[in-house]
């Protein structure tokens, strides 16, 4: 706040960041790096905060490309001092778990593995499979990820047969239970036939299945069955017996087991070259393989032990204590092994040991995991080569000097002008970079229900997307120099998103509208732009009347097609979301002058929107709180004319007076 005190000159963003670097203490703790929009980019820990944070900004040549990209976006640094490095590690894991910073995702998931979600925050939690790991509440839990989605579906199907669970997201009937309750598949949560506490108790047993604690659950159910039998409650004992039999069927589907069946452990190994590492994590519970996770990681300048350590830090910061096994087997010694053991022990509240095994049985297990990692590394490298060939082919097709690294795709979605939105999707090195996706609501008053104009909408999005760059150019800044520096926050005030190529979903018309908007911004000579028409997959360039000569199956066109399809998917999903939200609101709330109270009064007086729509101006004006002017506005809303479409009567009266004058 000192910068804003009267008489003190305001500091520029680079000066504030440089001053912040000088203020960081030489103590253990955590640091949070934020961008110009106050988003947390990265959370880290260190035994000495000052030296660690400053190392990011001294010489970037020693940093990996991923971290260099991150430092260019940093506009603010926060720090939290702790008493020890172990305390800093625990705090770091909590911060990462809560904020999910993009650059803390050291690992790239090989696939979009599915999770099992239990919404513990609800009175009657739901249980379902999802590929989106988004926490709606800190109480909700995700179990997984699971490599075999087929096995996960079968397991969930059997679980719902063994345990009576909520079957539907919403009740089928408002006043009675459905067939699932009658056949014992559901405990009747919609009519509260079971208390919330009892339902949570059932679901805690289900969670044990997905935590790899089937043996523990089996012992618990056997104890319950004997207690019911001792009390001569044979019906309840029979129900638990059936659950035990179903649990046996669940655990029989494991495909791999080890001789030491009493041990639960995670096994980590990797295969790497100078740039890329493939990491495999096998989850063994009671000697059985219950899960396998495969990732690729940035390996530039990192030792194998350090890569495994970062995998451990990030993976176990995302899981519950019950999912931390008592033992970890790792392929290489870890730089801070004792510190990690202390952190995991504190998280699990029981002893956790990390071993780098030498004895044959455990070493053979490490070798098995490493072989899987080698296959994944080969597959990842082949994928990278394919992506590189695609961008090279695209550069040749469009006559670009270099293969485009950052490509942006845009699309418009609406229904006859209503709920008009646009999408911006970004591919980096040929792959979707979803953290850079953006959504736009079309703001032009000319585009509304019954009045659509895709050209105008696309031009509007270009103006909004590139206006910061246009201002920078108008201020005399060299855009080429800004792009070369990658938008370093220390020198360019946070500009860091210049695309190597912009692709528009559409033909010559949409492309012409975009180029006209870029001419207004004086950026038409700075940006590479093309469009992809839907029908024949034709590629157009600005100023060209004919499409480029290309084949629909060539790599560059296929890359544009994937980008176009992703932009279309993202735009349509946002449009559906906006339309759904609008439809949830009463149509009356769109009428100027009608607040929440008047809407309630109108509905109370007329009993339905249909009755309001059929009412005359005179009838409307007699409703409580509605005068002649507002009655006319309501009537005009439901009975638009070409001249009066959607305009309030007060505005119409002003226009008529002006015209008569």
Swiss-Prot record:
Domain GIY-YIG stretches: 26-105
PROSITE patterns documented for this protein: GIY_YIG, UVR, UVRC
Entry's localization field: Cytoplasm
Keywords of the record: Cytoplasm, DNA damage, DNA excision, DNA repair, Excision nuclease, SOS response
GO BP annotations listed: nucleotide-excision repair; SOS response
Subunit architecture: Interacts with UvrB in an incision complex.
Descriptive protein name: UvrABC system protein C
Organism expressing this protein natively: Synechococcus sp. (strain CC9902)
């Amino acid at each position: 706040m000192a910068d804003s005190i009267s008489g003190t000159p305001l500091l520029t963003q680079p000066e504030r960041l440089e001053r912040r670097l000088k203020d960081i203490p030489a103590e253990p703790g955590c640091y949070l790096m934020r961008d110009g929009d106050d988003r947390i980019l990265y959370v880290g820990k260190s035994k000495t905060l000052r030296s660690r944070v400053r190392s990011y900004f001294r010489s970037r040549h020693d940093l990996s490309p991923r971290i260099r990209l991150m430092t260019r976006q940093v506009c603010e640094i926060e720090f939290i001092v702790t008493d020890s490095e172990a305390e800093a590690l625990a705090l770091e894991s909590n911060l990462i778990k809560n904020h999910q910073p993009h650059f803390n995702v050291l690992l790239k998931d090989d696939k979009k593995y599915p999770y099992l979600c239990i919404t513990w925050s609800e009175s009657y939690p739901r249980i379902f499979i999802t590929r989106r790991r988004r926490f709606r509440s800190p109480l909700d839990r995700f179990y997984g990820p699971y490599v075999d989605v087929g096995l996960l579906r079968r397991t969930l199907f059997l679980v719902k047969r063994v345990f009576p669970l909520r079957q539907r997201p919403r009740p089928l009937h408002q006043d009675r239970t459905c067939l699932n309750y009658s056949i014992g598949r559901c405990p009747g949560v919609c009519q509260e036939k079971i208390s919330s506490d009892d339902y949570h108790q059932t679901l805690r047993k289900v969670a044990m299945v997905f935590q790899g604690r089937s043996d523990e659950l089996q012992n618990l159910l056997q104890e319950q069955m004997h207690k019911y039998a001792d009390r001569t409650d044979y019906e309840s004992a029979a129900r638990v017996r059936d659950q035990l039999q179903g649990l046996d069927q669940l655990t029989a589907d494991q495909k791999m087991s080890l001789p030491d069946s009493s041990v639960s452990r995670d096994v980590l190994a990797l295969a790497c070259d100078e740039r890329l590492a493939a990491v495999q994590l096998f989850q063994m519970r009671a000697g059985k393989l219950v899960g396998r996770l495969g990732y690729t990681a940035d390996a530039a300048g990192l030792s194998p032990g350090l890569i495994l350590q970062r995998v451990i830090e990030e993976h176990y910061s995302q899981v519950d204590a019950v999912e931390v096994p008592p033992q970890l087997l790792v392929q290489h010694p870890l730089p801070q092994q004792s510190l990690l053991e202390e952190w995991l022990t504190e998280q699990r509240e029981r002893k956790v040991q990390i071993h780098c095994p030498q004895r044959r049985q455990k070493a053979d297990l490490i070798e098995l995991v490493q072989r899987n990692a080698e296959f994944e590394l080969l597959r990842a490298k082949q994928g990278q080569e394919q992506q590189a060939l695609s961008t090279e082919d695209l550069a040749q097709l469009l006559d670009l000097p270099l293969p485009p690294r950052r490509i942006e795709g845009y699309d418009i979605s609406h229904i006859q002008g209503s709920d008009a939105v646009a999408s911006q999707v970004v591919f980096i090195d040929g792959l979707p970079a979803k953290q850079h996706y953006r959504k736009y609501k079309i703001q032009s008053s000319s585009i509304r229900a019954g009045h659509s104009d895709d050209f105008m909408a696309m031009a509007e999005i270009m103006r909004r997307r590139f206006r910061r760059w246009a201002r920078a150019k108008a201020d005399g800044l060299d855009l080429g120099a800004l792009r070369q520096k990658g938008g370093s926050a220390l020198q360019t005030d946070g500009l860091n998103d210049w695309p190597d190529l912009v692709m528009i979903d559409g033909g010559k018309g949409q492309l012409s509208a975009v180029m006209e908007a870029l001419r207004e911004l004086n950026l038409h000579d700075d940006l590479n732009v093309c469009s992809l028409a839907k029908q024949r997959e034709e590629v157009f360039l600005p100023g060209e009347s004919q499409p480029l000569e290309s084949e629909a199956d060539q790599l560059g066109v296929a890359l544009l097609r994937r980008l176009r399809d992703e932009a279309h998917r993202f735009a349509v999903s946002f449009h559906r979301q906006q339309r759904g939200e609008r439809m949830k609101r009463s149509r009356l709330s769109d009428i100027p002058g009608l607040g929440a109270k008047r809407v309630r009064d109108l509905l109370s007086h007329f009993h339905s929107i249909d009755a309001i729509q059929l009412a005359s101006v005179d009838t409307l004006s007699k409703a409580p709180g509605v005068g002649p002017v507002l009655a006319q506005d309501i009537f005009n809303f439901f009975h638009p004319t070409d001249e009066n479409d959607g305009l309030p009567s007060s505005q119409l009266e002003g226009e008529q007076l002006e015209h008569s004058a």
